[in-house]
Amino acid sequence: MDPNNAAASSAHDLSSLDLSCLNEAERIVINSFMRGPHAHFEHLGVGPNVKWDENLSKRAFYHLVAINHATLKLLVAQARLCSMQQMNAPNLTNGASATALGSLHPFSLGNPATSVTMASNPLANGPGLRTQLMAPDFALALLGNGTTPHASAGLGALNPGLYNPSASILGGPSSSGASSVLPSPSAHTPDAATDANHLPNPDPASGRQELTRAGRPARKKMKATALDAALRTEMPNWPSVQDDFVRWTRLAWFEAGFASTISDGAIGVQTRRPFSPFLTTTFAQVGVHLPSMSPNLLRAFNSWVDMHLRSLRDHFKGRIDKPHAGKASLAARSLEDTTFVSLTEFINNMCNSYNLINSELSVAAVRALCKLYLNVRNMATAKDSEGVLRVHIRDASNRQPPNILRGTLPQDREDDDLLTLITECGAIDFDLPTDTSDTMALAVLMVMSTSATTLTLDQAGCFSSLSGAASAQVNLLTNVTCEWFSVTMVTESGTSTISLPSSTRPSAHISAHGKDFALSWPKITEGLEIDIGLTLELQHNVTLDAYELRAKVVNHRPKAKASLWQLELNLRNVRQPEDGSAFFPAGYGVRYQGAFAASGSYPSSGATMQWMAAGGGAANEGQGLYLAAHDGYGYIKFLNAAAVEDVASLSIVYLVEDAGLPFAESTMPFPLTLAVVGGGDDLWYQAAQMYRTFALGEAQWMQAGRLHQRQDIPGWYVNNSIWINSGWQCHDIFNETQGDPHTVLNVTRRIRERFNTNMALHWYEWQQGPDANASARYRFDTHYPDYLPPRGGDYFGTVVRELEKEGVHIFPYINGRIFDVASTSYAQHNGSDHCCRKANPSFGAADQSFYVESYGSGSTFHTADPTDIYWQTTLADTVDALVNTYGVEGVYIDQLAAAAPTPDWTSWHNHTKGGGFYWRTGIVDIIKAMRQRVGPTVPLVTESNSEPYMDAISGFLTLVAFEPAFVGTKALVPAFPAIYGGYFVGFGDIFNAEDLADQDPLMARVVAQFVYGAQLGWFSLGGVTSGPDVDTSCGKMGEYDLWMSESSDAIVAAVEYYGNLRVCLLEYLAHGRILAPPSLSPAPAEFMAVETAVQNAGPFPSAMSAVWLHEDEASAVIIVAGVLDAGQTYNVSVDLTFSLPSLHDRQVTVQEMSCDGLSQQLDVMPANDIQIYDVTLSDRNARVYRVHFGA
């Protein structure tokens, strides 16, 4: 029988049905059937490409067809009954009507008047299954008889609560307290009278149904039905095991119609679910919750599943325990009577015993049998073996080398048997203890295995090993790691942090395919006055080939004074050898070697992204751990990483929404993702590509598109190469002339002429305030958010327009985050109402106070709530005036992406309290408010490159990104442009006056900006250069006179050269993305700055290099850039397949290019072995080589 035809033939003629009596989920089921069987399976979450001979076995596909055939029968019957009632049809009280409806009952595949068998059903090939399953009276029991107050509701009459395992299979109370809706005797077929004593009579007065046998509940009556008779026939001891049977089937893990969960104590563990996951998946896919389904319909589903799991349940449930008195278990018989020569024979024997066809077993069933086989074999050989048998098997295609064994194997294990295990079992991975013959003590370790990562947990849920596909022999963990997840609770008594797994063993469940698992602690708060449960799920992400951890905390006593504060995943004991490294996402990214400690609040300059990595080195065969929060909405969180003596730890802390407030349930709204990645010295790059896959696919901030797709990134802005600022000092030390319009006009004109290129001016100290007296001027970091009018009044606008005519684009400074408590606006607009309040961990988060900040100016600030409408409007007013009144082309709004969020617990603020993603949405709304005033084409930029603001912010001042050294044990790596290249604009670094006196460090900073794709400069023109106010920690910033000196001619020419080269390579450096770096031989020499009163004193490399991919991914450029004015020669080696695996086995064309349009072809080379010899650099120049990938 063709399954497609079977499903299609069951659809009947539905066009005349009245579907008004069906609920939403039921109408979806019928409508999907009308579209055809494959459309229906798509609704079921199976997918449109399901075929019996591909990813589903024929047996599983028939199960789906039969289940949905039964569903359709039920729904059609309900709709037709509704149609009859609406046509004033007589009550269904005669045999003919009953027979008519009986023909529609769910399991009647043939003549309704005859007993139904499953002989024609290819699924019913288990022993003894050719027996009557359902009689018409049972169908009427499902549908209602039309004579009770509930009958008009049909299948929807019963209480839509969850199934009660202690009730009968179809029993359960109604919403009015009545028993299940059962037909009256007159609704039976002619032999119904013999069954009359089993049926309740309606009591119109009470609306309840009475029982005709004293005190016997409705579920006992059902044992006299044909269904119960079938169960008795199949299982003579059914009365004694019914409750256990029903309970077990509710716990069964159901995959495509085949049971593959094994009971606790044998080869797996159980999970508690009110309905089979098949039903959950079925209706979750169409957006319908199970409680909205008719309870009888759900129960019919589950009853059908129960019956077809029966034979499998006999096989799996408790069959590996010790023999019980009076009967021998399957496991005992296997050990005593059978010698299993190979896994194949074992599987064949099991299939023959239960009439299962080996070739049609689902993958999950094969894996389950493999696990059972190993248990049996292990018990038979345990007395002769010691240690632990560890079996690591690759994916179903066996793409990796068959490196299977680790540890001690049973002596009789044969090589051909192991190869059979690979073939039959596919991608499974598990450990079995072989040091005991006590089968009840066998505790299978939970092991999740993908083609890239194998993660092993012991019986307590502790991480015991973490290894990658490159070598199963390498364990990235130095020790077993327990207490890797913690929950921080607050009560009236104080704060408690519970770390798990600990001595409290969880209940656990492994999925059928062996790649997902769940740990549950019903109560983690022993010894406390609260009752809190925790569930952790690790699920395999197929796209990323990684594991995603999800957490759910339940408060079983919501009225108790207890609340949740934060959740933390802390992976300790990560092996980081001396030659290994770690990555932390500050700025563009920092690579650490050796001991270190780093932390950052996300989103901020200290944690611009949400991922870390650690490991690498020869001992790890280049592999490391990737840990990330794959959160596409930007929830507030905290990242921490450290390493001591070759052991690293990585942790992510999630501040929960409404932290400290009463709660019933809290689910982490994003997964924490962990995986093993390769990469060796460039471990950071491979980890970055995994994060890039997530970000491009799920992150909200990617929706604005690439640079050329955005209106707020005009062409002149992308093409800009050099930035200057009017004068800035890191400790707010300014002289009087730095922001004066007359001074700014004069010095900017001359610098523009000196560099002979367009540039952007970041203008500080432009504000005056309402008092025109110089002594009353609003100085830097005072009076925020009050700025206007500007210094010089209308003359400020005149200077702006004059400079813009000469090719200088003006970006005045404002602050978007802090509120001066001494400002006029704070006093006039109840400033405290618009500011954030912090809370110490406490129940109710009642202990609140303002965040207080102060900088070099001495003013006191509170942090404004970015979601506050007043704050958004006030900032938009200022930007409106600057653009539309004074003519600036862009505005710099400080701190938005640099400063850490200040979680807010103010009760009347319109966002979640404490945790949440409101910080991102608030800042995005600030920018939206500004754009409503100035239009979409004005660049609005801020400090630092925090990812979640990319869709709103036009560019980022990258001071923090370029703060680390470029080589050494704490070095900048361009992870951010490796992920987001082509989607953002970065500009700027801190340059000191000392850098111009010692020109090589300045040139190193400029070259770093160039090779990493940023716009150059941010040279500070004004500043205090002498006297007691000179900044001795950050260095002198006033550089104008030095730039204009003849002694700087060479360095000016070099900066101009790299600025022009950047414009020439914009299609790569701005619109493309950076790849893994090339290798230079010999390694460039390193040097330190002569002057040390600067933030980055080195070490600096004498040359830097990079590979950039074009946006169309058809070519790349290899850049080698000189820092020193002395000659240097290098050989360059590039393996493009490391970054672009699609180029494997490809030949590429390499040519040296120049910006004058001339190029010289070098050779055709393998993409994985590009060699360019004798690359000579002189006079701080660069060599550029274009690589064409070809067809």
Curated annotation (Swiss-Prot):
Pfam families found in the cross-reference section: DUF6259
Keywords from the named record: Glycosidase, Hydrolase
InterPro entries: DUF6259
Example of a GO MF term: hydrolase activity, acting on glycosyl bonds
Family: Belongs to the glycoside hydrolase-like 3 (GHL3) family.
Residue ranges with Low complexity bias: 173-187
Domain of life: Eukaryota
Top EC class, one word: hydrolase
Region of interest (Disordered), residue spans: 173-221
Organism lineage string: Eukaryota, Choanoflagellata, Craspedida, Salpingoecidae, Monosiga
Protein name: Putative glycoside hydrolase 22789
E.C. number(s) listed in UniProt: 3.2.1.-
